A protein has these predicted regions:
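Bacterial N-terminal signal peptides
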Residues: 10-22
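N-terminal secretory signal peptides that target proteins for export/translocation
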Residues: 1-7
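Noncatalytic scaffold domains of N-terminal-nucleophile
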Residues: 26-48, 52, 60-154
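Short linear motifs in intrinsically disordered/low-complexity regions
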Residues: 5, 22-23, 117
Length: 154
């Protein structure tokens, strides 16, 4: 019985792997390379916003910020202003930087705010109440990187 179960699991995993073959690899079998820059996102409209920024003399940071805000409108499930993120960048000068603009706990949050007087977790308190909210970091992060590393020309 046990050997049959293991065999069934192996067959199931093999089928899933076979069916997900197209999901594992890139959408195009022939990679596309840009000669003067490239903008890629989950939304054609948002990518075009970034391309237009580059054409107007903006740098990659300007384009990334514009795409980030455009995604909040054109592809809100993939880019939104109610969350946060991470940015890793290398500028043309060779300088690199990172920015953590993830959501943060509200300022009045306390380390033990989800615990009762005995120090035990209050069930559901950290999931389904106003106390469980976080402060989005997307807008602050995009604006901060724009002002600190943008070209200043758009």
């Amino acid at each position: 019985m046990k050997a049959h179960k293991i065999f069934s699991i192996k067959v199931f995993c093999s089928i899933i792997l076979f069916l997900s073959h197209n999901l594992i690899y890139c959408a195009s079998e022939d990679p596309i390379y840009g000669k003067n820059g490239m903008v890629v996102s989950t939304s054609n409209e948002a990518s075009l916003v970034g391309v237009n920024i580059l054409k107007k003399g903006g740098n990659a940071i300007d384009a990334a910020v514009a795409v980030g805000f455009a995604l909040a409108v054109t592809s809100s499930g993939n880019g939104n202003i109610g969350g946060g993120g991470f940015l890793v960048a290398r500028m043309a000068s060779g300088a690199s930087f990172t920015l953590d603009h993830r959501e943060a706990a509200p300022k009045k949050s306390k380390r033990d705010m989800f615990l009762n007087s005995n120090g035990n977790v209050i069930p559901g308190m950290s999931l389904g109440t106003r106390a469980s909210s976080g402060v989005p970091g997307t807008v602050d992060g995009l604006l901060r990187v724009f002002y600190d590393y943008g070209s200043g020309s758009v």
